[in-house]
UniProtKB/Swiss-Prot annotation:
One of its GO terms (cellular component) is cytosol. This is Probable ubiquitin carboxyl-terminal hydrolase creB. Residues 1-45, 113-146, 238-269, 496-775 are annotated as: Disordered. Residues 668-679, 758-775 have a biased composition (Basic residues). CDD domains: Peptidase_C19G (cd02663). Disulfide bonds: none annotated.
Amino acid sequence: MGSFLRSFRHNGGSTAPSVGAVPAKKEPQPPPMTPLEKRLLDMGPIREDGSDKFYGMENYGNTCYCNSILQCLYYSVPFREAVINYPTRTPIESLEAALAKSLRYPNPNAQLEAEAQAEKQKAANAQRPGMPPNPQQKPEDKDSPEYKKKMALQTLPLLETQNNASSYGMSESLFTSLKDIFESVVGSQSRIGIIRPQQFLEVLRRDHEMFRTAMHQDAHEFLNLLLNEVVANVEAEASKQPPIEKSLPAPETADSVDQSSSTGSKTPNTTRWVHELFEGLLTSETQCLTCEKVSQRDEVFLDLSVDLEQHSSVTSCLRKFSAEEMLCERNKFHCDNCGGLQEAEKRMKIKRLPRILALHLKRFKYTEDLQRLQKLFHRVVYPYHLRLFNTTDDAEDPDRLYELYAVVVHIGGGPYHGHYVAIIKTEDRGWLLFDDEMVEPVDKNYVKNFFGDKPGLACAYVLFYQETTLEAVLKEQEQENMDSNLAATDANDTILKQNGFPQSPLAHVHSASQIPSHEDNLRPNGLRRAPTAPQLSTHHEHGDPESAPFSPLSPLSPLSPLSPLSQTPPVPPVPERVTTVATPPKNDALAKKERAREEKERKAAEKEREKAEKLRRKEQEARMKENQRREEAELKAALEMSKASKAEEDRRLSHENGKEKQGGSLSRLKRGSKSLSHRLGKDKETRSVSSDLPPVPIPEHSTLSQTGPTSEQQQQQQQQQSPPNHDQPPNSPQLGKPTIREDEQVNHKDSKHERTGHGKWRSFSLRKKSFSILS
C-alpha cells in the first residue's frame, strides 16, 4: 500500500520542465481575506439604503474624533435617511457618474511591487563595497492595528468626496459636505472601502478656527457643534425659499407631492428633523426657600451630559442628574418675588425625551490642585437597553425604551492627547469596531470592556441610544439564542471530525450492510487515532459470541489479507431509537423539546420547593403558636400559685395579729410577769444561802391574779432574800449586772421552752421585756 501511494505521488509530481523551457512568471497571490470580508460572504445583493456598506475613514492627523462621530451618525438609520433625502435625494445615476471619477481602486499588485523594490534596493546596497550593511529590521506584527490600517489603504477601494452642493441647490456648508459623504457611501458598488473626508475637514476648518490646528480635539464638542451646524444650515436654507402656496395641488401632481414629502423634500415641516431626532426638553424647577415660590424654565438639549461617580451606572448618574440641588452661599438664586438673592432648591426634570439619546459621560474634570483637566477612570456600567421616565406631570410620553447602538471610546490618559474609536451595532452584521481605516467585527461582550475598570486607558465617552420597542428586544434576544445554539452545534461538529470527515451521530453503530471492499482496504490509514483511555463496553454474560461488542477499531486493517464475509464478527442489534440520523431541523426540534422539558422540570421543581417551603413555614408557625400557648399556661399557673401563696401568707399574718390584739397590754404584762417570776425563782435557788425553803414553783400558764406582787414588791423581796453587799452603796447600778448575766442563762433555757409553745419570736419578746423591766 505504501509503495502504491509513493508511486502515485511520484507519477503525479513527475511533470518536470523540459530543458530550455522558460520558467512561468510567478503569479501574485491575493491578500488574505479580512474578518470583515469573511462575515460578508453570505450577503445578498447590494441594498439601496446603504445599510450594508462598511467603510473606514482615513486619518489626516488627529482627526479620529471626526471619524468616530461620523460613523456613529451614519449608522443611525433615521438620521442617515434624513440627510440623504434633504432637500432631495440625488438620483442613483448621477451618483454613479460622480463616483466613477472619485472612486479609485488601488493596484492589487502594489504591495508585491513595493516588496520587490525593497528587496532590489537591499541587494544593491549589499553589493556596494563601501556601504555598511543595513541592520535587520524587525518583522511587522500583522495583528497590530497599524499594519491592518496600512494594508487597508493598499488593498481597499478609496472613495474621495467632492463638493456637490450645487446639485442640491444649496451653498457649500458643513451639512452639504456631510451629505456628500453619506451619498458617496450609499451609491458605491463596493461594500467595503475607505473614505477620504478631506473636503469635509476643509469646510470644518474654514468655518471654525478651533479645528484648524492639528491638536487633539474633543469628540463630544465636535458632535454638539456638528448637530447645531446642521440645524443652522437647514434652517438658513429653508428661510431663503419662497413660502409655499396654500392652494391644493392638482390631482395629477398630488402623488408626486406626497412622495417628495415622504422622502424629505424642502418643506417647512422637514426642517425640524434634527430636533425630532436628537432634541429633548428639560424643565428647571427652582423653589425659593423664603417665599416658597416655584419658578420653571424649559431648556432644550441635543445631548445630555451627566456627572460620574465611582462604581456607579448610567441609571444612577441620570437619577443624580434629576436630584435636588441646594443653591446657597455664593450660588444663591435671585428671586423676583423677594427681590434679591435667596437660598433655593433646584431640580432638573425631563419633560420630553428624544428619539436618539446622545449621552455624554463627563470623563474630564477640572481640578484646582493641578489647574487643568484630568481624566476620571471611574467604573460606570452602561446597559444594552435603557428605560427612561419623564419626571414631569405634563409629559407627553411617560417613558421610553432605548437600545445601545454606538459607543465612542477615548483611549488615553488625559483630555489633551489620546485616540478615539467607535463600536457600532449594525442592522444585521452585529457589532463592528471602526478604528479610522480599519473595520473589524467584534463580539457583543466586547462592548463591556470600556466601563472604566479594565486595564488600560480606554473608557466609554459618548453613548448613543436609539428608540426601540419591547417586541424588537424580545425578537433580538430570541435570534441571539438561536445563533448561540447553532454556534454550539457547529463547535460540536468540528470537535467530532476525524480524518477530515464529519463524525456521524451513528458512527458507533455498524449495520449488516457495511461490507469492507477492496477499495476500502487500499485506503491509507495514516491519521487513525488510538484511544488513550480504556474503552467503555457493556458486560456480556455466559460468553455469548453474538452479543460481543463491535469496536470501531475492529475493521480489517489495510495491511491484513482480505477476509471472507463469514469471518466478520456478528453485528449487534441496533436500538430502535437510533435507527435514523437526525437532520439539523430535527436537531433543533429536539433541542427545543429538551429545553421545554427542562423548563417544565425546573418549574415543577420550583413549585415543589415553594410547596415544601410553605409547609415548613406552616409547621414552624404551628410550633411557635404551641410554644406561646404553653408559655401563657405556665405563666397563668405561676400567677395562680403566687396569688394562693399570697393569700395564705395574709391569712397567717392576720391570725397572728388577731391574737396579739385580743391580749393587748395585759397579755404582754402576763408574759412579762411570768418571765420575771420564773427568773426570780432561779435567783433564789442560786443565791439563797441561809434559807432552806424550796423555791416556789411558778405555773407555766398563770393568770394575772396568780402573778401576785407587782414589780416594786418583787424588788423588795429580792433585796430581802439576797445578802447585803457592803462594798457598794444600795442604789449602785452594779447590782443589776449579775442579774442580767444570770437572766441570760435563764432566758436561754426559757427560749427552748417558749419555742415549743409559742415560737421563737416569743422568747425574743420576753428577753426584751425582761431587759426593759430590769433597767
